[in-house]
Amino acid sequence: MSWQAYVDEHLMCEIDGHHLTAAAILGHDGSVWAQSSSFPQFKSEEITNIMNDFNEPGSLAPTGLYLGSTKYMVIQGEPGAVIRGKKGSGGVTVKKTNQALIFGIYEEPMTPGQCNMVVERLGDYLIEQGM
């Protein structure tokens, strides 16, 4: 299965009638493996800062998580594994695998829990596959 198919079929899928706003799979170096057409244009330092937070959990909390120049308030995640951000009625979930970062961005009516489930389920599967 292509990386784009993972984005299209496993991240941008329908959950209780709702979809993520945007999704992507990136390498740890910030290279885009696949993304939805709606995924924001990001800066390389934004991905570097996200990777730094996985290595030093809590480092993003004071400044916030920036993605595509949008600032998300960092909320409870799983240190070294999942970073979650909130902005207004939406947010972002980032799951780190051995080689990739899985991103899901949502807006209401999708819930944070639905976004977490979609992103983390794919991330856990890729980890099981050695990715």
Swiss-Prot record:
It comes from the Eukaryota. Keywords: Actin-binding, Allergen, Cytoplasm, Cytoskeleton, Disulfide bond, Phosphoprotein. Disulfide bonds join 13-115. It holds the Pfam family Profilin. A motif (Involved in PIP2 interaction) lies at residues 81-97. One of its GO terms (molecular function) is actin monomer binding. SMART domains: PROF (SM00392). The modification Phosphothreonine is found at residue 111. InterPro entries: PFN, PFN_euk, PFN_sf, Profilin_CS. One of its GO terms (cellular component) is cell cortex. It is found in: Cytoplasm, Cytoskeleton. SUPFAM superfamilies: Profilin (actin-binding protein). Occurs in many kinds of cells as a complex with monomeric actin in a 1:1 ratio. Binds to actin and affects the structure of the cytoskeleton. At high concentrations, profilin prevents the polymerization of actin, whereas it enhances it at low concentrations. Belongs to the profilin family. This is Profilin. It comes from Phoenix dactylifera. The lineage of its organism: Eukaryota, Viridiplantae, Streptophyta, Embryophyta, Tracheophyta.
